[in-house]
C-alpha cells in the first residue's frame, strides 16, 4: 500500500515537473517574436526616412532644373505688320468706335472710296474662291467665309455708292441689291446643305459680282 502511494506520488511529481521548462520556452519564444517585430519596425522606419530623403533630393533637383529653365531668355520677334500680319488677325487692327453707342458702332474700318473699292474687289474674289469648299460640301466653312466677305463687301459698296454722283447711284444700288439677293440664296443653300442650290446660286453670285465690279472700274 505504501509503495503504491509512493508510486502515485512520484508519478504526480513527474507530471508536474516539466511544466516549468515549458513555460520558460513559451516566454523565450514570445520574446523572440517581439524582438523580431521591433527589428521589423526599425527597418520600416529606416526605409520611410530614406524614402523621404530621396523624395526631397529629387524634388530639389526638379526645382533647380525648373528655375534654370525659367532663367533662359525668351526670344521675341518683331510685331506683326498691321491688318492681317498673322493668320487669323485680319480684323485685329481695324478701328472700333468704342466711344459711340453700341448700335452706332462700326466693326469695320472706314476707308476712302478708292480704297473701299479695292477692298470690295478683294472681298468679291474671296467669295469667288469659295468654289472648292462648295464642291467638297464643307458647308460650315462656306457659310462662315461667305458671311464674313459679304459683310466687308456690303460695307465697302455702300461707301463707294455714297461717293458716286446722283445719276450713278441708282444703277449701282440696283446691281448691289441683286448681288446680295444671290448671296443670301447661296447662304441658304449652304444652310440646307443642298449641292444643287449652292451651285445655282454660286453661278448667279459670280455673275452679279462681275456686273458690280465692272461699275466700280
Curated annotation (Swiss-Prot):
One of its GO terms (molecular function) is electron transporter, transferring electrons within the cyclic electron transport pathway of photosynthesis activity. Keywords: Chloroplast, Membrane, Photosynthesis, Photosystem II, Plastid, Thylakoid, Transit peptide. The keyword Transport does not apply. GO terms for biological process: photosynthetic electron transport chain. Its main location: plastid. InterPro entries: PsbQ-like_dom_sf (IPR023222), PSII_PsbQ (IPR008797), PSII_PsbQ_pln (IPR054099). Residues 1-25, 73-95 are annotated as: Disordered. This is Oxygen-evolving enhancer protein 3, chloroplastic. PANTHER family: OXYGEN-EVOLVING ENHANCER PROTEIN 3-1, CHLOROPLASTIC. It comes from Oryza sativa subsp. indica. GO terms for cellular component: chloroplast thylakoid membrane; extrinsic component of membrane; photosystem II oxygen evolving complex; plastid. It is found in: Plastid, Chloroplast thylakoid membrane. It comes from the Eukaryota. Belongs to the PsbQ family. Residues 1-63 form a transit peptide. The lineage of its organism: Eukaryota, Viridiplantae, Streptophyta, Embryophyta, Tracheophyta. Pfam families: PsbQ.
